[in-house]
Amino acid sequence: MLYRKIEKYIVSHLQSGSDKILIVDGARQIGKSYIIREIGKKLFPNYIEVNMETDKLGDRTFADAKTVDDFYLALSTVAGDRMKEKNNTLVFIDEIQAYDHLLTLLKFLREDNKFTYIASGSLLGVTLKTTSSIPLGSIIIRHMYPLDFEEFLIANGIGQLVLDAIRKKFASRESMPEAIHNKLLDLFKKYLLVGGLPDAVNEFLATKNITTIRTIQNEIHHLYGVDAARYEEMHNRLKIQRIYSMVPSNLENKKKRVVVKDIEDKKGKRMSDYVEEFDYLISSGITLEVKAISKPSFPLIENSGKNLLKLYMNDVGILTGIFFGTNIKAVMDDVASINLGSVYETVVAQELKAHGFNLYYYDNKKTGEVDYLIDDMEHLSVLPLEIKSGKDYQVHSALDKFLQVKEYNIQQAFVLSNAQQVKVKDGITYLPIYYIMCIEPKQAEDEVLL
C-alpha cells in the first residue's frame, strides 16, 4: 500500500465524531477510492461501499433515492444484513457526483445519525458549480492529488531520517551531501518520467519497465479526455476536448499560456467566451491553472484579475509520456539539445498545488515573466520562484528586474535547479530542485491567542 499523506486526515476525521461528512475530491485514478477503502476496513468492523457511477450504468438503484428512507432501502439491496449493525458501520459513497441529489441528501443522512459516512467524487468540482442545494454546512471537502515527490520518495524506500535531513537542510539553507544529492536527483528525474498516478508508481516499483508505465499513463490520459466529453452540451464538449488536447503544445511555446484564438481558430474570441470550458477542466482536477498577475501584493488572490492563464497537466508523468514516449534519455541524461523547462514547470505546479497553494505567475510587458508567485505567509509578502532545467540557472533577467521593484516588498526569492549547492546571492536563494517538497504553506500553531 502506497503511503498517502491524506490518510492521517481521513483517519482523524472518521475518529473525531464530526457532524460533517467528509468528501474526498480529485481527478480519476489518483487513489481516492483505494485509500478510503483501506482505512474504512481497518477502522470499522462493518464496511459498506457503493459506487454510484456503476449504479448509474447498471440497475440505477439510487437514482430516485431522494429521501433518507429511500436511500436506506436502496442501500439494503447492496448491504443486506450488514445494515443491522448500526454501530461501527462506515458507508462509503464512491463517485457521488453521479447523482447530484445525493449531495443534498448527505445533510439528512448525517442528522439521522444511523451510520458513519464518507464520500468521494471525481468530477465533484463541476457538480458543485451546477448544483444549487449543496448543504455546505454539512460537508467537508478535501482535495486529493497524485503522489507528490515526498510520497514518491517514501514509496522508493527513502526513510524518515533522510526526509527529516532534507527539511532540516532546507530550513537552514544548506546543501545535501553529494552522494545523497545524486540519489535524490536521480529519483527526481525518475519521478518526472513516472509521475504520481498510483498505478504508474506501483508498476515502476514492480518492474521498472517504462513501456508498461507509459501504457498505464496513456490509458489514464485517454480517460481524462473521455471525461471531457461528459459535459452536457455538445458544443462545450468539443471545446473542452480541444483545450485539453492543446495543453502539451501550449507548454512548448515560449509564453506557455493559453492562446484563445487557437481553440476554435476564430478571431475576436476572448477568454471570457470559454469560462465554462476552463472551469470544467480545472474543477475536474485534470488540469492545473496558473493565473497571471502584473502587480503583485500580498495576498495574491486580491490581484488575480488579469485575463491571462496557463494550464498544466495534473501529472508530470503523463506529460513526459506525450513528449518523449519510452525514450528516457531526454530526462535522465540532461541532453543539451532538449529543453525540459515545461516539464520542470509542470512538476513544480503539481507539487505546489498538492501542498495547498493557489498558483500564479508574474507577467509584465516591461519586466517579463517570473514562473511562479505564491503567498509567503511567514513574511506577509509574495515569494517568487524561478524554475531552471538547464545549467544556466543563474541567468534570470525577469526575476532580477522583478526584485528591483521596491513597492512589491519582496522578502525572499527562490531559484530551483539541478545544481547541488545552496547559496544566497543578491537576495536570491538557489536551491536543488528536490527542495520543492519543503515549500509548503506556514502551518498554524496549535493554539493562537488573541
Which stretches of residues belong to each language-model region?
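N-terminal pre-Walker A segment at the start of P-loop NTPase domains
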Residues: M1-Q15
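Conserved lysine of the Walker
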Residues: K32
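Hydrophobic positions on the alpha1 helix immediately C-terminal to the Walker A/P-loop
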Residues: I35, I39
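Short glycine-rich substrate-engagement loop in P-loop NTPases that contacts/grips substrate
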Residues: T54-K86
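Structural recognition of the conserved hydrophobic beta-strand(s) that form the central parallel beta-sheet
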Residues: T116-S122, H143
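Interdomain motor-coupling "hinge/lid" segment immediately C-terminal to the ATP-binding subdomain
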Residues: T130-E252
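Domain-level recognition of nuclease-like catalytic cores that cleave nucleotide substrates
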Residues: K169, N418-L450
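Accessory nucleic acid-recognition modules appended to NTPase machines
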Residues: N202-M377
